[in-house]
Amino acid sequence: MFHRLNIISSVVSSTLRSWHGSAGSKSVKQPPQPPILFDNENSPECRLVREALTELNLDVLIYPCPEGADRFAAQLQQYGGSNTSVPFLVDPNSHVKLEGAEAINAHLFQQYKQSSIPKHIDTNTLNLFTSRLASIVRLRGAIRAKPSREPQKPLILYSFESSPYSRPVRERLCELQLPYHLINLGKQQFADMGPASFRFHLGEYHPVPNTKRAKLLAEKGRVQVPFLIDPNQSIELLESKDILDYLNKIYAM
């Protein structure tokens, strides 16, 4: 029952943001090195950055920094100074370090799409307000750090920002300060719409060729988020509840 209510409130959270962070570009090429994002899942500004990452279909390495976090605090201060706050982006491909959603999103769209920030994810008053509402609906999820065992290697999470099923997983990763490679699988065509078990199309599902979705289907036989890979335990998991149970069992203290 709790998990069902958790997903319902996650749906409301995505609805408050008009489901931005669902669609993804078909053409963005992944850079040689993934950008690093110091992130708090519940931060209104961080949400706008993650929406931009989904729209660009850009993969990043996430260093979670919830309130009271200490695991990546030294690295964050080393990059940005003692008063640096999230979101904070380090892009090794262009040798830039940026703080705040406005500066980060401007860089991401200019660097990886040669365009300006779309209005619906700009840091205007309306977007920040609806992003705050989306956080409130989640009952301040992922706002406080929880004790955890640190993995030797970052985990891998296939997700897209507005996914109601992926959000609780990202929140738990954030609470436990578990670093992870975020593989964004934004929806690129009408056939991608809807949950994996009931897509809004007729016939066999075919992703856009030569994309991450096509590669995932070829390798795993299914395109579904959240999809977690833990290279430390040689584990692959679908279904948000199973992933949450796994994270609690292996990493929570």
Predicted segment positions?
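GST-like domain detector, emphasizing the conserved glutathione-binding G-site
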Residues: M1-M253
